């Protein structure tokens, strides 16, 4: 679960990390109060979960109320579905530093990551100039020690008062990481002001989905989703993604769904949805189709391969979904696996042709969407 920047910074402040003064606004009518509290110049930061906000023009520095309101209006009306802005004081910056904490899955340890250059895309820097990145691994049972922090800051070339300040930030970031069951806690950039103070300029916090139940402060809300249907799917525990294509894809299992998604694109088609009803969701065909039908499409492609999830149960669920929602689009099916012969009979009785070759099913769906079948 990825948190918004304002939420990450709230978590940082709870653990003693310094952040710029900021006020969250959800509409134009809240701007005057925010400007009165924060002052000018200030920064308008769009609260969206996608990365690259600066490059996308979603973070703007403003110097007065008139320009700030015009800029805020543009951001709220942008194609990026901005529903919240963080109005934050502008910081007099001398330099920027990168800090993050994540998990090393190979060594099963917590990994501290630092770079003396902040505001960077760390993945690109790792590929082009890896020597600039310093990593220190921490045994979770042992916990963070002073030598871990010193190894990181010294490795970044930081010493004296600056090294101590950055070290204190590392300790606070580690506390945040552990307290929130995080997969990633990141400050990029960490501002070093001209008077020598360290301030978290940006914040990213991703909570492990398996531990969200331990974090009641962050319930699943509409704010985290671009569309109402994605929110509904998340509430049901059904993985759902929406695209601009015309082939509604219903599959069982993440691996199969991803494979079929790629096959559709390879065949010249364009998915409208990516929906999984495998695993624990394999009896949710009725609800899955209901979600699919909320996105316009020309054809519905159903591909499953059941092992523990029985093919006949999925086929029966699909037939019930068709009876319940009576979709107008043609339906292409390829349901294989445990009890597949029974599944084929169920589909034939419902007037559906059970295909047994995934590539054939994909091609037929693509042809239907293109008007060739």
Swiss-Prot record:
EC number: 6.2.1.-
Database matches in PROSITE patterns: ATP_GRASP, SUCCINYL_COA_LIG_3
InterPro entries: ATP-grasp (IPR011761), ATP-grasp_succ-CoA_synth-type (IPR013650), ATP_grasp_subdomain_1 (IPR013815), Succ-CoA_synthase_bsu_CS (IPR017866), SUCC_ACL_C (IPR005811), Succ_CoA_ligase-like_bsu (IPR005809), Succinyl-CoA_synth-like (IPR016102)
Enzyme type, top EC level: ligase
Residue ranges annotated for the ATP-grasp domain, each copy included: 9-249
MF term (GO), any: succinate-CoA ligase (ADP-forming) activity
Domain of life: Bacteria
Pfam families: ATP-grasp_2 (PF08442), Ligase_CoA (PF00549)
Sorted UniProt keywords: ATP-binding, Ligase, Magnesium, Metal-binding, Nucleotide-binding
Recorded GO CC terms: succinate-CoA ligase complex
Binding site for ATP: 35-97
Induction: Induced in sulfoacetate-grown cells but not in thiosulfate-grown cells.
Record text on cofactor binding: Binds 1 Mg(2+) ion per subunit.
Cofactor: Mg(2+)
Function per UniProt: Involved in the degradation of sulfoacetate. Catalyzes the CoA- and ATP-dependent conversion of sulfoacetate to sulfoacetyl-CoA and ADP. Cannot use other sulfonic and carboxylic acids, and shows only residual activity with 3-sulfopropanoate and malonic acid.
Quaternary context: Forms a complex with SauD.
Protein name listed in UniProt: ADP-forming sulfoacetate-CoA ligase subunit SauC
Native organism: Bilophila wadsworthia (strain 3_1_6)
Lineage start: Bacteria, Pseudomonadati, Thermodesulfobacteriota, Desulfovibrionia, Desulfovibrionales
Gene name as annotated: sauC
